[in-house]
Amino acid sequence: MTKQYLTHRCLIAPPEMADDFFANTVIYLARHDDEGAQGLIINRPSGIQVRELLNDLDIEADHVQPHEVLQGGPLRPEAGFVLHTGQPVWHSSIAVGENLCITTSKDILDAIAHNEGVGRYQIALGYASWTKNQLEGEISRGDWLICDADMDLIFNLPYDERWDAAYKKLGVDRIWLSSEIGHA
């Protein structure tokens, strides 16, 4: 049987997620392969505005539209990841989906500060990661549900609506879910 990888899909935390850090989250999976998986939480605001973050990095950002930085995950919370539309043209960019990239280099932050060449974007501090077969085990135990990623879910919806919207992509109203997902 061929293994199915989940790159460019989203993990949805079930209502009874025991891990407080991941409770009520939607995670965009930027990479999933035979070595493991990495992703960014796309619905947990950090309380930091993009302008504030850029100014802290000595990047003048007076013209940046109000936009909140996300708490991307528990690992390396000091590291920034920019999930954005477009092609991987920045110094440290990788394509993770059709017209979707992750960039970690400062040049994209300069472009964001000057409203140059960056379409829709989310800046996240930190990321989530799973070792080989760890995510598969968590999914088989019912620790995560999976939905397709789309630009609306990633970029357009207010953060506090993304968890419910991810469930709706599955045709499910989460209010009706049992705390025993996968254990009928």
Swiss-Prot record:
GO terms for cellular component: cytosol. It comes from the Bacteria. Pfam families: DUF179 (PF02622). SUPFAM superfamilies: VC0467-like (SSF143456). InterPro entries: AlgH-like (IPR003774). Belongs to the UPF0301 (AlgH) family. NCBIfam families: PRK00228.1-1. This is UPF0301 protein ACIAD0353. It comes from Acinetobacter baylyi (strain ATCC 33305 / BD413 / ADP1).
